[in-house]
Amino acid sequence: MMHLRLFCILLAAVSGAEGWGYYGCDEELVGPLYARSLGASSYYSLLTAPRFARLHGISGWSPRIGDPNPWLQIDLMKKHRIRAVATQGSFNSWDWVTRYMLLYGDRVDSWTPFYQRGHNSTFFGNVNESAVVRHDLHFHFTARYIRIVPLAWNPRGKIGLRLGLYGCPYKADILYFDGDDAISYRFPRGVSRSLWDVFAFSFKTEEKDGLLLHAEGAQGDYVTLELEGAHLLLHMSLGSSPIQPRPGHTTVSAGGVLNDQHWHYVRVDRFGRDVNFTLDGYVQRFILNGDFERLNLDTEMFIGGLVGAARKNLAYRHNFRGCIENVIFNRVNIADLAVRRHSRITFEGKVAFRCLDPVPHPINFGGPHNFVQVPGFPRRGRLAVSFRFRTWDLTGLLLFSRLGDGLGHVELTLSEGQVNVSIAQSGRKKLQFAAGYRLNDGFWHEVNFVAQENHAVISIDDVEGAEVRVSYPLLIRTGTSYFFGGCPKPASRWDCHSNQTAFHGCMELLKVDGQLVNLTLVEGRRLGFYAEVLFDTCGITDRCSPNMCEHDGRCYQSWDDFICYCELTGYKGETCHTPLYKESCEAYRLSGKTSGNFTIDPDGSGPLKPFVVYCDIRENRAWTVVRHDRLWTTRVTGSSMERPFLGAIQYWNASWEEVSALANASQHCEQWIEFSCYNSRLLNTAGGYPYSFWIGRNEEQHFYWGGSQPGIQRCACGLDRSCVDPALYCNCDADQPQWRTDKGLLTFVDHLPVTQVVIGDTNRSTSEAQFFLRPLRCYGDRNSWNTISFHTGAALRFPPIRANHSLDVSFYFRTSAPSGVFLENMGGPYCQWRRPYVRVELNTSRDVVFAFDVGNGDENLTVHSDDFEFNDDEWHLVRAEINVKQARLRVDHRPWVLRPMPLQTYIWMEYDQPLYVGSAELKRRPFVGCLRAMRLNGVTLNLEGRANASEGTSPNCTGHCAHPRLPCFHGGRCVERYSYYTCDCDLTAFDGPYCNHDIGGFFEPGTWMRYNLQSALRSAAREFSHMLSRPVPGYEPGYIPGYDTPGYVPGYHGPGYRLPDYPRPGRPVPGYRGPVYNVTGEEVSFSFSTSSAPAVLLYVSSFVRDYMAVLIKDDGTLQLRYQLGTSPYVYQLTTRPVTDGQPHSINITRVYRNLFIQVDYFPLTEQKFSLLVDSQLDSPKALYLGRVMETGVIDPEIQRYNTPGFSGCLSGVRFNNVAPLKTHFRTPRPMTAELAEALRVQGELSESNCGAMPRLVSEVPPELDPWYLPPDFPYYHDEGWVAILLGFLVAFLLLGLVGMLVLFYLQNHRYKGSYHTNEPKAAHEYHPGSKPPLPTSGPAQVPTPTAAPNQAPASAPAPAPTPAPAPGPRDQNLPQILEESRSE
């Protein structure tokens, strides 16, 4: 990124060089001109004269009616750089031009057509008389004269034009070379050492070959620009070195038919190895070969040819003949130095400073009925005609002439690239012969034809020995007219009858009967006649440069079109864009193929080529097998970490990028790798960097081996602790003098395929290693299921579409909405008020529309359905394509709707706005529904990765999982598929299509099962310690398993129940890398049925004294026992016996000191542990079912109920994320060593569902529910409006009752309490010696508190409180209010 910024800054700096500064070059050029600088072919009246043809003028230019070739011409008085052109119709009229052609030149008798991108010479004009339409040209040309040729205008009016040109003055320093001269430029410091360079100049010539520029250095650096076959070649090298493996030479070609005597603009920008090569506005970007970044040039640079001793090095190259203008090298104008004869310039020969080549006067034949008729000298006995022509067409009429005295006619035609001569005379056999070969190559060819009595001669290009002479009895009398390029219509009027089509191309130097035709007189209609031609210009251009045919398709062109031949490319279509082969073996399987070799194209229409693979097609999947050159064991010795062995893997018929595209598009890939060693280590080193490793996709190094997982530097034996040395993680790391092997499958898709194997520890005398790699095997297509749902007015934004000349879009949609935009991308304006765009939308429920503007105005294709509507909530496939030849649209299997593109079309697909998926720009016309498998030019958009629920989108298509026909029971996860859904039961204790099949086992007396938790947890921690996306324990508020899954059916808690907001154990926390088990909580659920007691149903032991147990007591009741820390906890689960042989269910969840319990359909109860009880079940060890066979100290209460063991059925057992019965009955045999160690069963254990019935579509009625309790524990479940009304009624009655009680309480207790008054006593009562008064009332007695049910009663009553002191004298006369005691 830093290099890119520097490159842009340097380009901006060097672009300010003299003659190449574009900044501020936007002056209006027509307005300041004098009236004499504006001319025209004719004008309609004085008020429509050319001098009024200025923007925003009071009138405008209009030619006279009947002008066959109208034009408006501007003389800028000196050379200018033109960057934009603008047009306007005539003021206050119906006159405007809708299409026109732009010609430019340095002289009034030599014109060059300006071609837009796509070699289109036609500009869009106006749609009314007032609006100004401006075109910013894709490259800036230089000229003094500008000519506008109207091609179409308003049919309700006539031609009307006001013109504006934008640019700036231009200083031209011209060098003319005649093929024998050249100049050299000596560098200021004798050498040039540069990280960046800019070469820029203009040239014109009529020669096909010539050296334009050359410089070289002593270290092998050089840069050369030359013409070869009228193509411009750039040769560049930044040097080569014997120790560098890659050569530095790079050659790039640009353009075609550059010998057309038109100015061509060349620019080369280099920064390091990054190069931009520009020719006439077309930019090629490439990276130079080699490893160096500086260009080291010695002494001098040569222009136009070589000087002195330098000719010996490039003696086979021709010097340039023509004109070169403004040669710029790193802000130095070498042409200016040459004009000023600077001392650093050396001349070879006589270099002129103006163009001396004769100015050609060609005729451009470009119409369907074009021709030029010139008079001849009649009744001569010798017919002599010569001319020069150039064309791309295979056929065309070159010349037709009627012989005098009715003797017949002479016809020269172009057929299959050669000139055919036909002389027809009455009464004689027609004379026919041909000359030349491949004359339709776009170059000038000269034809000389002479016919006289009894013989005819034709020669092509004056090649000696190439003329064709024919002797035949002929009688020649010249006629009065010669028709070049075609016959006029109607032919009978002109007496020109030919079955050949009109010629399209250029002609010049026409000679009739030895006289050169004055084309100036012909143009002014003072000699002969013409139609649909342009004088003084040749509009030939190379439509195959750049090549519009993709994937190495061959381009063949005509005058106004091109054709692509796609044989042997693996593609088809108008531009070889559509893939011929399917993208995977899975696609061949779905089409009914059987196993065999097939050609696949994983990236579709993308740049990667198709290749051959072997398809192992089976009933349910198709394996794609890609073989390579390392299928046999490779022996390695003598390598070290400093100089390792690099074992590159060359896949058959495919490059690394192509195989990577296959893996990237596959659902699953695997590749077996095996390393055998003898005193050779593999991964373990002291510094951490391995001795050996493998390299995968994108040249990334990977330090894990087969059978292991990414991110951990281990082999397969390091995961299950089965390595030779337990302290190491690979067998080979033991470094023993005997053969060891580490092997296994590599299955992480994003790392495959293996491209190199690096071996680095075989340099000891006894060391040796061998490695072996099996073919890459893949199946599935993960791109086809990349699905998203749009719920509201939402849209996804992606980077703009990057398409050169073609675009194809395909996707599936499903909706019930009547309309919506699937995708839209807008671009910057290609002219003043037009913006390119592409849009695919559901316009109505029966119409899918593909709308676009790629430079030719608004277009759209529509697929209409008469038999059904597209918003039927079913999947429909949409495919839309557009290229320079045509646009087409298809929905499902309906026929393609086609729209041919106009000839000479450029597909303007330069988009600078984000690509909107799900709506139009600014979220207009949003789509509501599902989209999947959206591809643009072979690249699949990651729709799921952009889904955001807060913005109205979600991954997958929620049509099935939101309203499933059958939900996923017991916390199973609903997985959306193409036209169905599946249930993922991996994290449940059940299986079946809907996670509704109970998995249980019948325990005989003495049968027990142990599941080693610590072993399983250690294995899980090892396997997923470096994978963040794998669920690992954590916390989430208010969570019950499965409640976050669409279609979840509650289990024992009842519908809609959620636990309080406590942290839930076992929930994933992003980035958590600790132990897999959370000791602060458990989740236990299971079902059982039995008729015997006592028994231990479930027991969890630990490495300390902590445990958890669910047991059946002697009386048949259920009890839960916990030992957390030092304080035991006992809770009686039921008070009734459960040994009735009926199924019973238990669900226990502990979070810290909060315990939630539910048995059968009893209400959920919540218990809280005392603060004296620990909140952690420390160091869990094993899970026992049926009987406890634990070594060490066991709680005596557990021992009491442990004999003789459980006899009955247990099912659906789940402890956190462990389901031991499911693991035992559903794990394929043989088990892995680790799982076999963790799981142990003693006695007879047979599978049984314990009498459970699978879930049905609706809730099972109580009378049929096997889990239903006896009648003394009724359970009511009301639904519908009756339940709602009943609830409202009950609530109203309860509220009324509560209100009455409140009113009664307030009324009864409003005046409750005692109001005590101490009256004044008699005087004698205060006399000394009198008896003290008795207290009127004693202190209030505090009632003894009642003991709680679980608390022991107090041993003795609390002592009475001390009486309050008697009131003082001052308070004896005050009233005292004593509140009523609580006992009242």
From Swiss-Prot:
Family: Belongs to the neurexin family.
Domain EGF-like: residue ranges: 540-577, 957-996
Short sequence motif named SH3-binding, residue ranges: 1328-1369
GO molecular function list: SH3 domain binding; signaling receptor activity
Disease / disorder: Lethal congenital contracture syndrome 7: A form of lethal congenital contracture syndrome, an autosomal recessive disorder characterized by degeneration of anterior horn neurons, extreme skeletal muscle atrophy and congenital non-progressive joint contractures. The contractures can involve the upper or lower limbs and/or the vertebral column, leading to various degrees of flexion or extension limitations evident at birth. Neuropathy, congenital hypomyelinating, 3: A form of congenital hypomyelinating neuropathy, a neurologic disorder characterized by early-onset hypotonia, areflexia, distal muscle weakness, and very slow nerve conduction velocities (NCV) resulting from improper myelination of axons. In its extreme form, it may present with severe joint contractures or arthrogryposis multiplex congenita and respiratory insufficiency. In less severe cases patients may achieve walking.
Record: glycosylation sites: 120, 128, 276, 420, 499, 518, 597, 653, 664, 763, 804, 843, 860, 948, 956, 1078, 1147
A GO cellular component annotation in the UniProt record: glutamatergic synapse
S-S pairs: C25-C168, C323-C355, C506-C538, C544-C555, C549-C564, C566-C576, C930-C957, C961-C974, C968-C983, C985-C995, C1209-C1250
UniProt function note: Required, with CNTNAP2, for radial and longitudinal organization of myelinated axons. Plays a role in the formation of functional distinct domains critical for saltatory conduction of nerve impulses in myelinated nerve fibers. Demarcates the paranodal region of the axo-glial junction. In association with contactin involved in the signaling between axons and myelinating glial cells.
Tissue: Predominantly expressed in brain. Weak expression detected in ovary, pancreas, colon, lung, heart, intestine and testis.
SUPFAM superfamilies registered for this protein in UniProt: Concanavalin A-like lectins/glucanases, EGF/Laminin, Fibrinogen C-terminal domain-like, Galactose-binding domain-like
Membrane-spanning ranges: 1284-1304
Annotated signal peptide: 1-19
Entry keywords, A to Z: Cell adhesion, Cell junction, Disease variant, Disulfide bond, EGF-like domain, Glycoprotein, Membrane, Neuropathy, Phosphoprotein, Repeat, SH3-binding, Signal, Transmembrane, Transmembrane helix
Gene responsible for this protein: CNTNAP1
Positions in the Extracellular compartment: 20-1283
Cytoplasmic-facing ranges: 1305-1384
Residue spans of biased composition, Low complexity class: 1339-1355
Protein name: Contactin-associated protein 1
